[in-house]
Amino acid sequence: MLAAFSITPLGTGESVGNLVAETVRIVRASGLPNETNAMFTNIEGEWDEVMAVIKECVDAMAQAAPRVSVVVKLDHRPAEPSGRIHRKVESIEQKLLTED
């Protein structure tokens, strides 16, 4: 399963980078394939392990913020092999190369 998620602390002031960095540390420590970009963190794994990582991130953020906003988008294809986090992007890049 692929998950794209964003966790935002509310009520902590304008700068939230340190809190967001802590959640990225949690994701990276999970050992699951992941990527972080300007808006979301993507993570790949089995349903239970992905959701456990997201929960751990939310719980950590809730320790530092009185309110936490969470956005999650899931792509669940149980019959597909792992590695989709990179293959999906590679597929689009290949299509762009062949259309030029």
Q: What residue spans do the PLM features occupy?
A:
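Charge-rich, low-complexity N-terminal segments
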Residues: 1-100
